[in-house]
C-alpha cells in the first residue's frame, strides 16, 4: 500500500479539458502503472462522473442559439469579386482551367477559414454560454466544422470522386440553401444509406482478403537466428521524431549499438521508451532492427522478429496468431473510417501557402542571377529562387533585409516599389504536412465547334507516334477558330464518297458529316516511301491529298478544300479529310462563269499539277441516268487512256484516270432494274418469270418496270434484275437468235421469220436459256447517246487581252466513266453521270522551262464593283522539293514559313504584274522588273496570272517600271518586316476601270510601301486591302457589308472600324491571333479574341476564336487544323492536388497499394536505370547467386516503400497502425518469385510462382542458377497462391482451385488456421500449438558499422553480409581488394 501511495504522489495532476487523445494516453499510462483490473475500476468512476455532470448541465438547443457572423456579407462579396476577375483572365486565355480551379478553390477556402476563425471570438463576446458553442468545443458530438456549417458558410464541396466542385455554397444551414446549393450539398453530404453500406461492405471485404493472405502466420519459434535487419536512422531529419519513436518502440535490435567504445544496447534486446530517448539524444549511428521482413521463414514468424505484443507490452507469446491480428488491425480502421464521412459532410479542406510581407514601403532590390522566371500555380508570373535569397528594401531612412528561403516564389520584380505589408514572396508549404499530394488528370473540353490551331511546336508522345496525342514543350495558346462543321444527313453519308459532287441543299441534314477516308491511303504512303525522292522523275509523286474544286450550282460556288495535317515533311504526312466550303452568292450569273452548270475545277490542295493532268471537268446533264443499266460501245474499238490500271488510283494528283476515251461519237445505255437483296430475304417472284409494273417482289419492294425477272444468288446476297423488252420464241432457221449480247443498228435484219419487221431504233438482243432444250430471245430497248465536242471551255476562260496563255495549253477530252459492258448501279434515286468532259492542262517544253514538270494552281478571288470573281492562276514551278514546308512558324500566324531566304522553300505564290506581251517577255527574262519580284528574293519562280478580260486594258508605259524601281532603291521609308505573311495590294492605275486586288504570297510582308512621293504624280493611290490566304489556296475574302456563310465554318466575323494609323499596321499582321482586350489603336475599342483575316485602312476583320492556355507537359488531343465539335477533349493537364481530408479517398488508395494496381505513370528511363543497375550487380556478384541477390534487393526496396505508402494513407487520417502489422501483410505479397524462361532448370516449370526462400534453397542444392524475377502479387492473387489448396478453395474460384489441385496432385499439410477450421480440426495456435521449440543456434555476430543513412542501403548491406559465404565460393581474388564501402554504395553513382 505504501508503494502505491508513493507512486500516487508521483502522478501528475491534470487541470485541463481532456479530449479523446488525452484519454487514450491516460488509459495506456494507467495500464502501465497499475495493470488491467485497477484501470477498469478507475474508468468506471470517470464514466459515472461524466454522466452526472451532463445531467446536471442539461443543455438544450434551439434555432435561436445559432448566431450568424456579422462580417460574412462583405467577405463573400469580396471573394465573388476576385472570382469574377479570375473568370475574365481565363476567358482572355491568361490562365488555364486548372489554375483557375486552384485559385478559386483557394479564394473560397480562405474566405471560409476566415469565417471559421471569426466564429469562436464572436461567440465568446456575444454569448459565452451558448449551447452551440459549448457543444462544439466539448469534443463530444459535433465539431467546429459542423458548427461552422450551421452559422458560417458551408464552403466548397467535393463530388463523389473526391474532385472539387468549384461552385461554393455561400449560405449556411441557418439561412437555408438555394436549389443549386442544395443539390451540390447532396453530392457532398454522402451520408446516404446506400453510400455508407457500400463503403462498409468494401472495407469488410478488404479485411477478409487481408486475413486470407496471412491467416497461416503464427509465432512458432523464439529465434530464427537471422543476422539481417533494417537500419533506421534518426539523423537525416526526414523522419519526424514521433514517427521515429513509433517505428522503434516494441522492436528487437538486430545488432549491438555502440556509442564510441561503449556498448549502449545489445543484440536481441527489445526497445522501450527509455532506449529510444537515449538514441534520440545521443544521435547514434543507424539502428538495425529486426522486422517480420528479416525473419527466415515465410510460413511462420519468430518471437524476436515480431517484437512486443501490442496488447500487454511483453515479447509476443509462442503460438499467437499474429497474421490474423495484423489483417484485422489494417482492415478495422477502414470500417470505422467509412462511417466517419458525415462528420465533415464532404466539405473540402485544403492548405494555403505562407506569405512573406514587406516590412515597410520602399524599393525592392535582389540579385536577378539567382532567380529564374516561372508561373505560380495560379498562373501569375513570378521568380523561383533555388537558394537562399536576400532581398533589400530601401525606404527613405532605413534598409530592410528580408531572407527568402529556397524553393520560394518571388512575386515582385527588381526595383519595384512595394508598400508596407504587401506580399512579396510565397513560401512553398513544407513537406511536414501530412495530407500528401496525388496526381490528377483534368480534361479540358471544347466549348464550341471549330477548327484547331496552336501557336507552338508540339512533340509526339513516344508511345503514340502516329496518334493524335501531342505533348506541349512550352506554355502556349490553343485556338479554336469558331464555326459549325458541315452537316449532312445519313442518306448522303452512304452515297457520297470522298470527292463526290454535292449539291448545296444536301448539306442541310442534321448528322455530322464524316468523309470516308480512301482505302488507298496506305498504298500511297508505301509508294511514297519506296520511291522517295530518288532520281526517277516519272515515279515521284509530288503530294497526295484531296482536290480543291469549285462547283457552280446555281447560286453558290462551293470550294472544297481539305485541311492537311502536315508533320515535318512529306513522308509522314497523314491525311485528315476535312472540308471548308465558302459559299459566295454571285449576282451577275449571266456574264459570270458558266451559268448554272456543273463545271468543277479540280485543284490539288498543294496545287501541283503534272503534265496532262485534268484541270477541270464538266458533267453534262444530258448524260445523266436515274436507273441502273449496262453501257455498251458495241463493236467499236475503244482504248484506255492509261493502260496501267493501278498507276495512280488513290486520290491525289489526278492524271488521266484509267477511263475509256471514245474514238467515235456515240455509246449505248441498256437500262435494267437491279435490286440487291440480303441472302435471307424471301422473294415473291420466280426466276425467268415475267412481271408487270409495280409487282410485289419482296415484302417492302415493288418493281418499277415490267419485264423478265432474273435471279442470281451470290454468296451472301441475291441480285434480282428485271429486263424490260420483248420476248421472241425464234424458229430454228433464225440466225440472229444464236448470238447473244448483240447490238443491232436500226434498219437491219428480221427478228422473226413470221413478222419481217424493220428495226426502227437500236436494239440489244440477249439469248436466255431457262432449260437445256428451250431458249428464247429477249430484245431490249437501248438508249443511244451521241457525244458532242463538249462545251467550249473558252467560256470559262474568256479571251485574254494579255495573251499570256502561250505557255499553257488546255485541251478538251471526253471520257466515259464506265467500262464497256460494265453494269452500273444507281443507289436510291441518285442520278448516274455517264460521260465527263475534261479540260486537260499541258504546257510547252521550251528551253527555259524545260525543267518544269509540274504547275501550281490556285484560286484568286477578286472583288470588282462589289462582286466577287474567281480567277484561276497557274504557276509553272521549277524546284522539285519546294513544298515541304512546316506548318508551324515562329510568328504564330499559322502560315507557311521558311526562315530567311533558303532556296528549297520556294514560295509558290510570287506573282508578276505585267501589262503587255512585251512586258511579259521582259519580265520573264528579267524577273526583277516589277515590284513583286524585286521583293521576292527567289529568282527561280516564274508565274503567270490568268486575269479576266473584263477589267483589263492594255497599258504601255515604260516609265512605270523605272519609277518604281528607282523609288524603291532610294526611299528608305519602306518598313520591311521579315516575317511571313500573305500580302495583297491594291494597284490602282488611271486607265483601269476599277482596282484589282491580287493575292500574292511573299516572303516579306510589306505594310505600306506604296505611299511613295514619286508615285503620287503618276498614280492616284487608294487604300490597301490585305487578304489571308493559306498555302492550301483557301481564300477568305469577306464582303464587309454582311457575314459570309462558310459552311462548315459559319465564321463569326467581327468588324472593327478605327482610324488606321501607321503604328497600328505595325502591330497587326495578317493571320495573327489576338487575345481579347488587347488594344491595338490608341483610342480604339477593345478587340474580341480571334485571327486577323482582313486588314483595311480603317478597319480589320477578325475571325472569332477562343484561346485556351496550355502549360508544358499538357497533352493536346487532335491534329493541327482539325475540325472539333463541342464537347471534344482538347487538352489533358496532369496536376498535383492535395488530397482532401476524407478517408473515402484513403481507403481505395490502400486497396490499390495492396492489390498492386499501378496508378502512377512511371517514366521510361527509370526502368532502364534499374535494369542496368541490376545487371551490374549480377556482374559484380558472379553468376550463380546473381538472381538471388538481385531479387532480394528489389524485394527489400519495394517492401519498404509499400509500407510507407500504406502508412501515409492511414496517418493522413490520424489513424495509428503499428508498422509490423503492415509488414506482415507486405511480406506475404512480396515473397514470391516468378520462374522465367531463360534458365532451363529441371525443377520448376517456367511461369511458376514459388517462394523466394524455396528458390534459394533449391538453387543451393542443385548448385546451378535458377532464373527468376520478383513479382508483386496483389492480396487477392497471393491468397490464391498459398501452400494450402483448401484455404484457396474456400476463398474464391472453388471449382477451379480444386480441379487444378487434383490435376497436380497437390498435398495440403494443414499448417494454417483456415484449413483446419474447414476440416474441423484443432487450429495450430494458442493451446493447440505444439510448442516444439528448437533451441536456436546462436550465430557469432560480427557488428558492422556503416555510415549510410538510407533504409534501403542498410537492408542491402545486410543482404550482402548475409551472403558473404557465397561470395567466397564464386568470386575471384580481385573482388576482395574492393573495400566493402564501395559495393555498398554503388547505387549512389
Curated annotation (Swiss-Prot):
One of its GO terms (cellular component) is DNA-directed RNA polymerase complex. It comes from the Eukaryota. Transmembrane segments: none annotated. One of its GO terms (biological process) is DNA-templated transcription. The keyword Ligase does not apply. Zn(2+) binds at residues 224, 295, 302, 305. Its main location: plastid. It catalyses: RNA(n) + a ribonucleoside 5'-triphosphate = RNA(n+1) + diphosphate. Keywords: Chloroplast, DNA-directed RNA polymerase, Metal-binding, Nucleotidyltransferase, Plastid, Transcription, Transferase, Zinc. Binds 1 Zn(2+) ion per subunit. Pfam families: RNA_pol_Rpb1_4 (PF05000), RNA_pol_Rpb1_5 (PF04998). It is an enzyme of class 2 (transferase). DNA-dependent RNA polymerase catalyzes the transcription of DNA into RNA using the four ribonucleoside triphosphates as substrates. Belongs to the RNA polymerase beta' chain family. RpoC2 subfamily. In plastids the minimal PEP RNA polymerase catalytic core is composed of four subunits: alpha, beta, beta', and beta''. When a (nuclear-encoded) sigma factor is associated with the core the holoenzyme is formed, which can initiate transcription. This is DNA-directed RNA polymerase subunit beta''. It comes from Atropa belladonna (Belladonna). The gene is rpoC2.
Amino acid at each position: 500500500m505504501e508503494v502505491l501511495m508513493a507512486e500516487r504522489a508521483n502522478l501528475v495532476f491534470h487541470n485541463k479539458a481532456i479530449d479523446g487523445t488525452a484519454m487514450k494516453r491516460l488509459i495506456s499510462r494507467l495500464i502501465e502503472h497499475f495493470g488491467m483490473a485497477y484501470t477498469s475500476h478507475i474508468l468506471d468512476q470517470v464514466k459515472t462522473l461524466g454522466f452526472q455532470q451532463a445531467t446536471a448541465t442539461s443543455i438544450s438547443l434551439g434555432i435561436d442559439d445559432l448566431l450568424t457572423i456579422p462580417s460574412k456579407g462583405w467577405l463573400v462579396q469580396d471573394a465573388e469579386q476576385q472570382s469574377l476577375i479570375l473568370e475574365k483572365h481565363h476567358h482572355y486565355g491568361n490562365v488555364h482551367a486548372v489554375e483557375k480551379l486552384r485559385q478559386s478553390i483557394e479564394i473560397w477556402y480562405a474566405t471560409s477559414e476566415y469565417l471559421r476563425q471569426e466564429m469562436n471570438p464572436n461567440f465568446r463576446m456575444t454569448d459565452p454560454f451558448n449551447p452551440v458553442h459549448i457543444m462544439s468545443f466539448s469534443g463530444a458530438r459535433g465539431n467546429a466544422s459542423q458548427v461552422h456549417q450551421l452559422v458560417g458558410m458551408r464552403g466548397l464541396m467535393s463530388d463523389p470522386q473526391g474532385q472539387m466542385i468549384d461552385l461554393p455554397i455561400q449560405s449556411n444551414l441557418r439561412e437555408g440553401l438555394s436549389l443549386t446549393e442544395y443539390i451540390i450539398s447532396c453530392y457532398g453530404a454522402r451520408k446516404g444509406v446506400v453510400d455508407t453500406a457500400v463503403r462498409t461492405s468494401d472495407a469488410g471485404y478488404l479485411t477478409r482478403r487481408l486475413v486470407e493472405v496471412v491467416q497461416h502466420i503464427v509465432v512458432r519459434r523464439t529465434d530464427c537466428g537471422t543476422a539481417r535487419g533494417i537500419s533506421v536512422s534518426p539523423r537525416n531529419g526526414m523522419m519526424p521524431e514521433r514517427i521515429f519513436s513509433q517505428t522503434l518502440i516494441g522492436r528487437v535490435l538486430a545488432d549491438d549499438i555502440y556509442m564510441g567504445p561503449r556498448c549502449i544496447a545489445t543484440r536481441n534486446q527489445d526497445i522501450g521508451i527509455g532506449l529510444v530517448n537515449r538514441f534520440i539524444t545521443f544521435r547514434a549511428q543507424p539502428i538495425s532492427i529486426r522486422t517480420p521482413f528479416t525473419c527466415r521463414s515465410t510460413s511462420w514468424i519468430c518471437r524476436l522478429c515480431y517484437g512486443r505484443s501490442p496488447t500487454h507490452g511483453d515479447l509476443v507469446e509462442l503460438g499467437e496468431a499474429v497474421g490474423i491480428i495484423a489483417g484485422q488491425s489494417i482492415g478495422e480502421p477502414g470500417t470505422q473510417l467509412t462511417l466517419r464521412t458525415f462528420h465533415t459532410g464532404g466539405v473540402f479542406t485544403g492548405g494555403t501557402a505562407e506569405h512573406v510581407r514587406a516590412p515597410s514601403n520602399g524599393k525592392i532590390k535582389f540579385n536577378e542571377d539567382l532567380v529564374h522566371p516561372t508561373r505560380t500555380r495560379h498562373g501569375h508570373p513570378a521568380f523561383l529562387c533555388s537558394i537562399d535569397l536576400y532581398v533589400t528594401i530601401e525606404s527613405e531612412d532605413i534598409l530592410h533585409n528580408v531572407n527568402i528561403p529556397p524553393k520560394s516564389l518571388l512575386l515582385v520584380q527588381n526595383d519595384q516599389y512595394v508598400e508596407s505589408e504587401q506580399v512579396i514572396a510565397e513560401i512553398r508549404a513544407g513537406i511536414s504536412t501530412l495530407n500528401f499530394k496525388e496526381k490528377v488528370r483534368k480534361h479540358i473540353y471544347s466549348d464550341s465547334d471549330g477548327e484547331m490551331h496552336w501557336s507552338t511546336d508540339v512533340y509526339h508522345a513516344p508511345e503514340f507516334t502516329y496518334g493524335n496525342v501531342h505533348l506541349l514543350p512550352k506554355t502556349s495558346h490553343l485556338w479554336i477558330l469558331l464555326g459549325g462543321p458541315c452537316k449532312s444527313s445519313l442518306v448522303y453519308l452512304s452515297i457520297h464518297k470522298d470527292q463526290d459532287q454535292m449539291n448545296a441543299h444536301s448539306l442541310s441534314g442534321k448528322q455530322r458529316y464524316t468523309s470516308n477516308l480512301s482505302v488507298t491511303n496506305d498504298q500511297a504512303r508505301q509508294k511514297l516511301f519506296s520511291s522517295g525522292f530518288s532520281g526517277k522523275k516519272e515515279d515521284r509523286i509530288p503530294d497526295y491529298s484531296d482536290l480543291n474544286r469549285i462547283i457552280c450550282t446555281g447560286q453558290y460556288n462551293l470550294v472544297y478544300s481539305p485541311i492537311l495535317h502536315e508533320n515535318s515533311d512529306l513522308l509522314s504526312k497523314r491525311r485528315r479529310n476535312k472540308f471548308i466550303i465558302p459559299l459566295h452568292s454571285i449576282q451577275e450569273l449571266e456574264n459570270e462563269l458558266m451559268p448554272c452548270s456543273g463545271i468543277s475545277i479540280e485543284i490539288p490542295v498543294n496545287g501541283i499539277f503534272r503534265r496532262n493532268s485534268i484541270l477541270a471537268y464538266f458533267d453534262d446533264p444530258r448524260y445523266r441516268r436515274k436507273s441502273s443499266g449496262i453501257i455498251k460501245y458495241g463493236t467499236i474499238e475503244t482504248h484506255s487512256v492509261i493502260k496501267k490500271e493501278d498507276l495512280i488510283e488513290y486520290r491525289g494528283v489526278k492524271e488521266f484516270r484509267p477511263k475509256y476515251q471514245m474514238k467515235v461519237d456515240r455509246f449505248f445505255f441498256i437500262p435494267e432494274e437491279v435490286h440487291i437483296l440480303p441472302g435471307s430475304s424471301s422473294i415473291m417472284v420466280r426466276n425467268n418469270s415475267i412481271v408487270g409494273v409495280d409487282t410485289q417482289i419482296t415484302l417492302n419492294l415493288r418493281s418499277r418496270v415490267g419485264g423478265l425477272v432474273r435471279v442470281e444468288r451470290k454468296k451472301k446476297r441475291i441480285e434480282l434484275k428485271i429486263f424490260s423488252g420483248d420476248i421472241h420464241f425464234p424458229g430454228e432457221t433464225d440466225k440472229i437468235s444464236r448470238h447473244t449480247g448483240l447490238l443491232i443498228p436500226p434498219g437491219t435484219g428480221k427478228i422473226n421469220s413470221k413478222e419481217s419487221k424493220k428495226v426502227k431504233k437500236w436494239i440489244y438482243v440477249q439469248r436466255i436459256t431457262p432449260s437445256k432444250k428451250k431458249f428464247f430471245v429477249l430484245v431490249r430497248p437501248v438508249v443511244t447517246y451521241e457525244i458532242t465536242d463538249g462545251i467550249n471551255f473558252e467560256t470559262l476562260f474568256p479571251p485574254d487581252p494579255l495573251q499570256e496563255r502561250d505557255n499553257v495549253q488546255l485541251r478538251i477530252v471526253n471520257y466515259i466513266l464506265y467500262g464497256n459492258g460494265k453494269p452500273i448501279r444507281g443507289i436510291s434515286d441518285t442520278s448516274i453521270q455517264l460521260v465527263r468532259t475534261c479540260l486537260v492542262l499541258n504546257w510547252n517544253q521550251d528551253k527555259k522551262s524545260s525543267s518544269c514538270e509540274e504547275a501550281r494552281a490556285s484560286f484568286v478571288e477578286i472583288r470588282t464593283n462589289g462582286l466577287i470573281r474567281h480567277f484561276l492562276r497557274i504557276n509553272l514551278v521549277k524546284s522539285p522539293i519546294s513544298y515541304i514546308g512546316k506548318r508551324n512558324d515562329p510568328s504564330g500566324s499559322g502560315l507557311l514559313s521558311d526562315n530567311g531566304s533558303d532556296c528549297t522553300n520556294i514560295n509558290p505564290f510570287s506573282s508578276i504584274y505585267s501589262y503587255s506581251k512585251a512586258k511579259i517577255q521582259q519580265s520573264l527574262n528579267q524577273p526583277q522588273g516589277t515590284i513583286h519580284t524585286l521583293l521576292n528574293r527567289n529568282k527561280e519562280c516564274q508565274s503567270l496570272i490568268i486575269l479576266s478580260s473584263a477589267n483589263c486594258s492594255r497599258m504601255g508605259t515604260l516609265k512605270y517600271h523605272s519609277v518604281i524601281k528607282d523609288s524603291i532603291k532610294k526611299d528608305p521609308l519602306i518598313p520591311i518586316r521579315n516575317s511571313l505573311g500573305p500580302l495583297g495590294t491594291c494597284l490602282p492605275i488611271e486607265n483601269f476601270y476599277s482596282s484589282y486586288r491580287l493575292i500574292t504570297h511573299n516572303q516579306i510582308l510589306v505594310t505600306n510601301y506604296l505611299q511613295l512621293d514619286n508615285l503620287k504624280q503618276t498614280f492616284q493611290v487608294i487604300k490597301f486591302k490585305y487578304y489571308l490566304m493559306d498555302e492550301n489556296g483557301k481564300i477568305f475574302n469577306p464582303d464587309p457589308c454582311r457575314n459570309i456563310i462558310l459552311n462548315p465554318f459559319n465564321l463569326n466575323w467581327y468588324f472593327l472600324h478605327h482610324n488606321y494609323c501607321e503604328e497600328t499596321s505595325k502591330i497587326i499582321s495578317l493571320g495573327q491571333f489576338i487575345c481579347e482586350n488587347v488594344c491595338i489603336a490608341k483610342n480604339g475599342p477593345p478587340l474580341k479574341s480571334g485571327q486577323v483575316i482582313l486588314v483595311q485602312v480603317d478597319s480589320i476583320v477578325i475571325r472569332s476564336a477562343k484561346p485556351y492556355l496550355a502549360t508544358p507537359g499538357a497533352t493536346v488531343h487532335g491534329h493541327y487544323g482539325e475540325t472539333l465539335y463541342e464537347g471534344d477533349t482538347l487538352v489533358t493537364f496532369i496536376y498535383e492536388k492535395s488530397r482532401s481530408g476524407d478517408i473515402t479517398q484513403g481507403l481505395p488508395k490502400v486497396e490499390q497499394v495492396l492489390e498492386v494496381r499501378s496508378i502512377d505513370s512511371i517514366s521510361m528511363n527509370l526502368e532502364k536505370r534499374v535494369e542496368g543497375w541490376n545487371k551490374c550487380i549480377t556482374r559484380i556478384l558472379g553468376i550463380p547467386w546473381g538472381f538471388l541477390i538481385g531479387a532480394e534487393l528489389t524485394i527489400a526496396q519495394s517492401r519498404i516503400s509499400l509500407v510507407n505508402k500504406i502508412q501515409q494513407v492511414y496517418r493522413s487520417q490520424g489513424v495509428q497502425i503499428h508498422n509490423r502489422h503492415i509488414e506482415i501483410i507486405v511480406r506475404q505479397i512480396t515473397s514470391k518469385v516468378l520462374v522465367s524462361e531463360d534458365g532451363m532448370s529441371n525443377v520448376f516449370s517456367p511461369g511458376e510462382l514459388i517462394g523466394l526462400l524455396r528458390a534459394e534453397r533449391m538453387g543451393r542444392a542443385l548448385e546451378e542458377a535458377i532464373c527468376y524475377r520478383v513479382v508483386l502479387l496483389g492480396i487477392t492473387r497471393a491468397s490464391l497462391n498459398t501452400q494450402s489448396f483448401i484455404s484457396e478453395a474456400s476463398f474464391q474460384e472453388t471449382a477451379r482451385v480444386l480441379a487444378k489441385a487434383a490435376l497436380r496432385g497437390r498435398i495440403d499439410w494443414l499448417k494454417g488456421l483456415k484449413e483446419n477450421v474447414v476440416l474441423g480440426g484443432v487450429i495450430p495456435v494458442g493451446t493447440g500449438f505444439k510448442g516444439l521449440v528448437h533451441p536456436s543456434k546462436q550465430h557469432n555476430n560480427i557488428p558492422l558499422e556503416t555510415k549510410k543513412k538510407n533504409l534501403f542501403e542498410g537492408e542491402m548491406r545486410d543482404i550482402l553480409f548475409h551472403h558473404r559465404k557465397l561470395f567466397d565460393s564464386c568470386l575471384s581474388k580481385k573482388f576482395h581488394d574492393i573495400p566493402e564501402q564501395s559495393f555498398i554504395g554503388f547505387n549512389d553513382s
